[in-house]
Amino acid sequence: MRNKVILIFTTVLIFAAMLMVTGCGQTEEEKAATDEFNKEVARIEAQLEQRDKDVASAEEVYAIEKPALDDKLKPALQTEITEAKALEFEAPKAPRKLEEITAATDELKKIDFTKDLEELNKVKDDLDISIKKCELVTAPKESYVVNCLKGIKNIDGVAAVTEDHDPNGNLNKEGGYTAQVYFSSSLVDDPYLDSDIIEAGTDGGGSVEVYKTPEEAKKREEYLATFDGGVLASGSHAVVGTCLVRTSNNLTATQQKDMEKAIIDALTNLDNAKTDDSKDETKESTDN
């Protein structure tokens, strides 16, 4: 009798163990609910694995020691990296009862780091592009500026100054520009249309002055700003990288803004690769 009891007890233990291995006696509905629960856990854990990869990529861009056109992007990326690293998730144990499994799964479905990662990657990409754009306008070659200006609507001709033909006399001098490219525009009234582009100066359309450093460009821009609103006003002026973009005072305010934007967009267009053309080939060009 004792052996029979032991045999029955052993059989019960084995059966219980089998139940644990095969789902601890869960119904098909409970098994399906548990699978859905585990699926959500795996989804969230996969997002965190992707987070680690995205953070590593973002940190590489953040570590680039070059200026960006938008100086707000680097601190913005630092914030995104910090917030992404703070994302946490500890997988809970699956409940046993159907109602509890379903409720827990519903809570897991509310956890989604997709938008966090999208924002991290967006700011990372924006900073990367901004750095590359800034490189284009950091002491660019004269030929690059000329080629950019030639493709802009309402710019009819361009001419780069030389040391022999430089009205301001600042080419290659200490604190002066390394290149100055004037352009003429059909938007300006007739008196300037038949003039020598360089002699007409900024009044004939505008110009782009290139400096060695952003500080030198800003210093020049601040100087021009002292004449704004007066009889000696020379038109609009804006610094981008180490370039000073100027438009004629003979243009309307709207025309100045549109022209300035078009020039900056062209200079910072990543499709416009810097060229190694000889400066002698870009002294003067007129579109027909």
Where on the chain are the PLM-derived regions?
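A short, solvent-exposed beta-edge/loop patch
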Residues: 199, 222-288
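Structured segments of extracytoplasmic/periplasmic soluble domains
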Residues: 47, 54-57, 61, 80-90, ...
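Sec-dependent bacterial lipoprotein signal peptides
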Residues: 1-22
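N-terminal "mature-domain start" segment
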Residues: 53, 60, 124-185, 257-288
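Amphipathic alpha-helical assembly segments used for oligomerization, scaffolding, or translocation
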Residues: 2-6, 24-138
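Stable alpha-helical elements in mature extracytoplasmic
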Residues: 40, 77-80, 116, 141, ...
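Second-shell loop/turn segments in exported
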Residues: 132-139, 205-210, 244-252
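Short, solvent-exposed recognition patches
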Residues: 84, 150-230
